[in-house]
Structures are given as C-alpha cells and as structure tokens.
C-alpha cells in the first residue's frame, strides 16, 4: 500500500497567496489600524432586555463554549478571542482543522506562511501588535511572532500593570498610540 510509505514534506509550500512586490518608488502609504473589539458581554442579563426581541435574537444563541456555532459562524459573546485573531491574521477559519483547530494559536501559528502581517511587510509597512492582556497569555507573544509581527507589546510593555480585567479602552489606546509614535520607521 503506497499510503503507508507516504512521507509528508517538511514544509508544505502555500500557493494561495503570492507576496506582493514593494511599491516602486515608495509611495506615502496610509496607516492601517485593525482593532479587535470583542464583546464578552451577554445583553440578556440586562433588566432592559426583558421582553425585547433584539435580546432574544438568534445572534446571541449558540451551541457551545464561546457561541462559535451561531448563525453568523463567528464568536458572538464570550471566548474565542485568540481564534478570532488567528482567523483575521491568517485568513483561515480555525474550524477547517477540526477539533484541533480550537488550539490554532498554540498548535498552528508556527506553520502559517502567508499572513496579513507578512503581506503588509512586503508592501513596506511596519507591523506592530498591541495586546491588551499579558504578553504570554495563551502563548500570544510566540503566536504573533509566527504571524509575522515585527513588534509585539503586551500590557506590561505599556506600563499598564497586570490587571487587564479592569483596563479601560481609553487607557490602552492612549498608551498604544504613544508607543506606536516612538516606534515609527
């Protein structure tokens, strides 16, 4: 049986995406900011939601942890942030890898060859990731290195302490913008 002798290649070359050539001559390029603002808040707990149709919407129903099987086929409330990040940065839905895909940032990030940060670098962009929790949370620093970010800053790097549960968006954005200004090429 030939399948018993099959040896997978050390690295499977991707053919889906081709790196773009850097613009010549270098053009003034706009800054690109992508902000993942997830909701871990279930609106059904509000008294104002009692009897309101929008609060009973199928968008807030799912069949599992993180509601990842909802009608939008995306996380709707609570959980799955690292999976949303993986999907956005790689262009791959983690579910195509089966149950093991639920650990994509831990088990698959190191195998990603064509990612959004790497593509942006071929266009001449500097890539900086600002992580709103501890840099080692769910191995984020390593995953983001594999995704191709040149710089990765967790809340420790922004002097925001370690209590990310009480961190306000405004605090994070102020510190992040200050750090980005210092790091610009």
Give the residues covered by each predicted segment:
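Soluble catalytic regions of membrane-associated enzymes that act on cell-envelope
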Residues: 1-185
């Amino acid at each position: 049986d030939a399948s018993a002798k099959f040896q997978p290649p050390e690295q499977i070359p991707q053919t889906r995406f081709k790196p773009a050539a850097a613009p010549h001559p270098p053009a003034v390029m706009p800054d690109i900011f992508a902000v993942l603002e997830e909701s871990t808040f279930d609106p059904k707990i509000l008294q104002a939601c009692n009897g309101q149709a929008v609060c009973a919407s199928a968008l807030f129903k799912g069949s599992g942890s993180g509601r990842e099987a909802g009608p939008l086929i995306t996380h709707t409330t609570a959980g799955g942030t690292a999976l949303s990040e993986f999907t956005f940065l790689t262009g791959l839905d983690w579910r195509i890898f089966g149950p093991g895909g639920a650990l994509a940032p831990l088990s698959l990030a190191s195998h990603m060859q064509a990612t959004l940060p790497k593509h942006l670098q071929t266009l001449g962009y500097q890539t900086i990731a600002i992580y709103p929790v501890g840099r080692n949370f769910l191995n984020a620093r390593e995953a983001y290195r594999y995704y191709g970010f040149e710089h990765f800053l967790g809340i420790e790097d922004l002097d925001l302490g370690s209590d990310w549960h009480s961190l306000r968006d405004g605090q994070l954005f102020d510190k992040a913008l200050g750090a980005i200004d210092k790091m610009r090429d």
